[in-house]
Each structure stands twice: as C-alpha cells, then as structure tokens.
Amino acid sequence: MALKTFNPTTPSQRQLVIVDRSSLYKGKPVKSLTEGLSSKGGRNNTGRITVRFQGGGHKRTYRLVDFKRRKFDVEATVERIEYDPNRTAYIALVKYADGDQAYILAPQRLAAGDKVIASEKAVDVKPGNTMPLQFIPVGSIIHNVEMKPGKGGQIARSAGGYAQLVGRDQGMAILRLNSGEQRLVHGTCLATIGAVSNPDHGNINDGKAGRSRWRGKKPHVRGVVMNPVDHPHGGGEGRTSGGRHPVTPWGKPTKGKRTRSNKSTDKMIMRSRHQRKK
C-alpha cells in the first residue's frame, strides 16, 4: 500500500504522511471474534499511574487474533484484510473449510481469496502458511515465530517485521532477527511464511500532536524541564544539561543501559544485537 501526502490547506497537513488504507475492509469486525477493551489511562487497580503519558484516545474493540495457528491440516480461505487499531500490522479474516472463522496476522502479498493452511508437516512455502521451523527451507523469511512449542507466536509480529531462518543445528533453528540478533529456537516451534503487512508504517508522519492524542499518547515531558522535586534532572537556572548521566524519575540509569537479566536463556542467543555489525 502506498503512502498518502496532502495539499497543505492547514499547517498540520503540510508534514502529514499516512498509509493509504483504501483497499482495506470498511465494515465492522466479526462480533464473535472481538472483546471489549476498557481504557486504563496508564493506571493500575489501585488507581495509581504505572505508565506515564498514557490516556484518552479513541475507544477500541479488541480483535482476538490467533497467534497459535493450531488448527492443523484444515485449509482456510482469506475473506478480507482488515485494519486493527490494537497493532501496527493488518489482520486477515480467514474462514476454514469446516466453517470456523479466525483472525490471523496478515503477511505481505496476502489477498482476499487466497488459501492458507497450518500443519505439523511440511506444506507449501507461501505467505500465510504455518509449519514447524524444522520443515521450513533455510533462507526463508518468516514471522509470528514461537519461542516455546504451543505457546503462540512472539517474534516478528509488528508491521513490516520478519525474521530469517539462517540455519539448523541439532534440532534447533537459527534465526536472524531485525535487530541483528541471532538466536536458537526449537525446531518444533511453529512459524508463518512471509513478512508482516504494512511495511510503510515506519514512514508515516503524524503532522500534529493531536494525532498522537487520538492514539492515547500524551506529551512525553523531559526530566530536564521539570523541578528538582519531580525529577533528578530537574531544576537549575536557565537551560541545563541535567548534570549527570541520564536517569529515570526514580534515579535508575536509562538511555542505553542494559537491563536484560534472564541468564537461563542466554545460551539461546548466538549473537547479541549489541555486537558490532560486521
């Protein structure tokens, strides 16, 4: 899908670049595949702000997307491609041969009328088909990759995202992720062929603050413009640099400080995303 620019009849339209969604379905989602979604405004069950700068935004309905794809060996037909306000990618409504319906992540080049299938055996290597990594040809572009068999896809799910299967080793598959990381995933984990739809999402320009507010994002206030009571970087006469290495409002290092501490899965990472690109 192409990008849309606008004749600047207002100041906000001068910079505005959005994705042309004219080819997407214009109706409402399937009611049996949706749930209500209440607005939290960044608050937890005690009413305290636990995530800053969230609140407002348009009301949403949550679409139940099937990330597990465990309805094996039943062919499904793509009914339509839909917009989903809860994610950056588009979703596809599929209807199985037995009459069941489901939403799946729409990969690039998937269109209404296409057939998709999920299997525990090898199937055709075409966008939307799901099978275990042990049967996918090396070099394939994949998305919605499981990290534990049966848990559902967790890797490469956002707009334009993908991973590449670069090898196999003793029952494990070696994946190269967009971040540059190379990691091992068990060969029985499922993955779907293709890259995720809406790759132009990274090129959009909101043009005005209000468009972020429609999404429920409030202005992100920098610590350096606060008072000392509000932030470690606050205070000072005139503009200051903060006077110390960047920290959170609670004094913990931020902006690049590594926080990963799951040593049990370190052995699954063959090449860190932090290693210098060669």
Curated annotation (Swiss-Prot):
Alphabetical GO biological process terms: cytoplasmic translation
Keywords, ordered alphabetically: Ribonucleoprotein, Ribosomal protein, RNA-binding, rRNA-binding
InterPro entries: NA-bd_OB-fold, Rib_uL2_dom2, Ribosomal_uL2, Ribosomal_uL2_bac/org-type, Ribosomal_uL2_C, Ribosomal_uL2_CS, Ribosomal_uL2_dom3, Ribosomal_uL2_RNA-bd_dom
Presence of the UniProt keyword Nucleotide-binding in the record: no
Biased composition (Basic residues): 210-221
Statement: the UniProt record of this protein carries the keyword NAD: no
Region named Disordered: 201-278
Membrane-spanning intervals of the chain: none
GO molecular function: rRNA binding; structural constituent of ribosome; transferase activity
GO terms under cellular component: large ribosomal subunit
Subunit (UniProt): Part of the 50S ribosomal subunit. Forms a bridge to the 30S subunit in the 70S ribosome.
Entry similarity comment: Belongs to the universal ribosomal protein uL2 family.
Chain's role: One of the primary rRNA binding proteins. Required for association of the 30S and 50S subunits to form the 70S ribosome, for tRNA binding and peptide bond formation. It has been suggested to have peptidyltransferase activity; this is somewhat controversial. Makes several contacts with the 16S rRNA in the 70S ribosome.
Protein name: Large ribosomal subunit protein uL2
Organism field: Rhizobium rhizogenes (strain K84 / ATCC BAA-868)
UniProt lineage: Bacteria, Pseudomonadati, Pseudomonadota, Alphaproteobacteria, Hyphomicrobiales
Gene behind the chain: rplB
